[in-house]
């Protein structure tokens, strides 16, 4: 028979999600609840994983579907944000690269109410918040050029990013525009000019949590990860160290045959809290 399309594949994915709970109704798995106060709100992880499952069959649609454009426009948001819930389907690929293709099913089966997917991930894999922040930054920098096992071949024509919105200041610094400021685990990609091979490039980073003009929430838990990504002429990538100081200098030696160069910054809170589906961005954190 002819393929039925990714929409039907998405809905079949929901059937498996329901079945996860039905097979283990007393275990607390399956995410049959929201992540707001008293388990209020919807659950965007259902939509994200159904999309991801559909694209295991319709591979090219990861990148040629309109949801991909939505992802590029919203990657600064929390990965469990309700607005781009149909577009946040790449973190699953990163987790499968680290833990195997079976991991997403394991995550659904072994989650325990009232955990969100991040809490379940940390418990199941045994990582703490600091390590999780490192992993989310590693995912972000790999997403710039789709350097992820299993999707590289489909993303090779979509490498790189457009410049994020920056505001120049009189003291020589650039600040992210509030409209694109990273939330927890969201990220910005700053496009840089490519210097000659062997030249050391540096970025003087200053975290500004609580600054006027940005949303202020749990400012005492502010954190960041940042570093450089080089895309080479042969399609491979070279990554800098991961930097995390609130105020610090990141240094990277430009490799040979560098074609594109980026500076990536991600929100990395020192403590995790759940993101509620409330259709209200004004109570979401920002890490300028």
Describe the residue ranges of each PLM region:
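Beta/coil-rich, acidic/histidine-enriched accessory regions frequently appended to metallopeptidases
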Residues: 114-288
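Short consensus segments that form the blades of beta-propeller domains
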Residues: 39-41, 82-83, 215-220
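Zinc-dependent metallopeptidase catalytic helix centered on the HExxH motif
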Residues: 1-62, 66
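Active-site-proximal alpha-helical
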Residues: 70-137, 141-144
């Amino acid at each position: 028979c002819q393929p039925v399309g990714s929409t039907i594949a998405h809905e079949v994915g929901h059937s498996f999600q329901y079945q996860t709970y039905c097979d283990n109704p007393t275990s607390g798995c399956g995410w049959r609840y929201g992540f707001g106060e008293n388990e209020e709100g919807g659950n965007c992880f259902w939509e994200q994983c159904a999309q991801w499952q559909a694209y295991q069959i319709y591979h090219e649609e990861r990148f040629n579907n309109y949801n991909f454009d939505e992802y590029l426009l919203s990657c600064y948001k929390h990965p469990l944000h309700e607005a781009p819930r149909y577009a946040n389907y790449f973190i699953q690929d990163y987790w499968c690269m680290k833990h195997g293709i079976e991991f997403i099913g394991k995550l659904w089966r072994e989650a325990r109410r009232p955990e969100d997917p991040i809490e379940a991930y940390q418990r199941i894999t045994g990582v703490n918040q600091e390590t999780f922040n490192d992993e989310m930054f590693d995912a972000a920098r790999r997403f710039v050029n789709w350097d992820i096992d299993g999707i590289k071949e489909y993303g090779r024509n979509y490498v790189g990013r457009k410049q994020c919105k920056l505001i120049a200041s009189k003291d020589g610094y650039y600040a992210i525009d509030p409209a694109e400021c990273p939330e927890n685990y969201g990220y910005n990609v700053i496009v840089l000019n490519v210097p000659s091979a062997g030249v050391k490039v540096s970025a003087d980073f200053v975290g500004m949590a609580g600054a006027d003009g940005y949303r202020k929430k749990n400012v005492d838990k502010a954190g960041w990860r940042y570093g450089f990504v080089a895309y080479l002429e042969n399609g491979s990538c070279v990554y800098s160290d991961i930097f995390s100081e609130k105020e610090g200098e990141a240094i990277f030696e430009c490799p040979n045959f560098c074609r594109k160069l980026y500076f990536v910054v991600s929100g990395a809170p020192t403590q995790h809290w759940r993101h509620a589906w409330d259709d209200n961005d004004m109570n979401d954190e920002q890490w300028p």
